[in-house]
Regions:
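Positively charged n-region of N-terminal signal peptides that target proteins for export
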Residues: 1-6
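Bacterial N-terminal signal peptides
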Residues: 7-15
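Bacterial Sec-dependent N-terminal signal peptides
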Residues: 16-46, 241, 245-247
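Auxiliary, metal-adjacent structural segments of Zn-dependent hydrolase domains
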Residues: 23-25, 41-109, 114, 118
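Short pre-active-site segment immediately N-terminal to the catalytic Zn-binding motif
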Residues: 109-125, 140-143
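Active-site recognition of the HExxH zinc-binding catalytic motif
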Residues: 123-137
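Post-HExxH zinc-binding segment in Zn-dependent metallohydrolases
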Residues: 143-183
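Pan-zinc metallopeptidase signature
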Residues: 187-247
Length: 247
């Protein structure tokens, strides 16, 4: 019996040692396959969007469903309400300093008329779907600068996966090179850092992106939290959950 206990302890110690990745600054985790088994399959637009949606939103959702990353995201979104379509849309007047789209909680996405004329409206909608994934439907969305950056990064990776020469502006045009620099550190297959990228390099670009958003309206408001991840912590857990599935 003592011999068995010793062997078991040795195996556990070796497993823990192998999981550690000091270069990344945080531990990589492969999510269990069991989690995937609970996600809905073969989702249709009508399974997500409550009746009465505009064709523009139905078409944009269809585009997202037919993209690898987008399909993964919408499977997670659907899992929040397996038995009914719960995503609703509400048109609002445009106001200076406010986003043209925003997730208001409880499955409600608000938008201005300007968005309907955007050729990349699926990317903007993907962004809001990601906020649904982050926040769920049981409580109001958190006003977190870190969450906004994570959604921007997810949107960029979705846009990049389409191999299109057109892309929706994220925050503003000056932010794009900062976002691209941060995205260049991320392994699209896992959500963790690419091989050869040091945590210090990643962290520097992460803070620069966070700083940019934090000074930009409306994210510079007193009701917004910075939520900066601690050093050696991964700041984008939902992005890792989305990408690290190998579906």
């Amino acid at each position: 019996m003592k011999t068995c206990k010793f062997i078991l302890l040795f195996v556990l110690l070796v497993s823990c040692w192998n999981c550690a990745e000091p270069e990344l600054g945080f531990e990589e985790k492969v999510l269990p396959d069991a989690e995937l088994n609970f996600l809905p399959e073969n989702i249709r637009v009508m399974d997500l969007l409550a009746p009465g949606y505009l064709d523009a939103w139905g078409d944009a959702t269809f585009t997202i469903l037919n993209n690898s990353i987008g399909n993964k995201l919408l499977r997670y979104v659907k899992a929040l309400s397996p038995n009914r379509a719960f995503i609703r849309f509400e048109a609002i007047p445009g106001e200076d300093g406010l986003p043209d789209m925003a997730y208001a909680g409880s499955g409600l996405i608000r938008y201005t008329g300007k968005v309907l004329n955007n050729d990349c409206k699926d990317e903007l909608l993907f962004h809001e779907f990601f906020h649904v994934f982050q926040n769920g439907i049981e409580r109001p969305p958190r006003k977190s600068v870190n969450n906004e950056l994570e959604a921007c990064l997810a949107q960029y990776l979705y846009s990049d996966s389409k191999s299109s020469s057109y892309f929706a502006v994220v925050i503003d045009r000056d932010f794009r090179p900062i976002l691209v620099a941060l995205a260049s550190c991320i392994d699209k297959r896992t959500g963790y850092l690419k091989e050869g990228i040091s945590y210090d390099e990643f962290h520097e670009k992460y803070v620069a992106a966070l700083d940019f958003i934090a000074k930009t309206p409306p994210y510079n408001g007193s009701d917004w939290m910075r939520d900066q991840a601690g050093y050696n912590e991964h700041p984008f857990p939902k992005l890792v959950q989305l990408l690290n599935q190998h579906l």
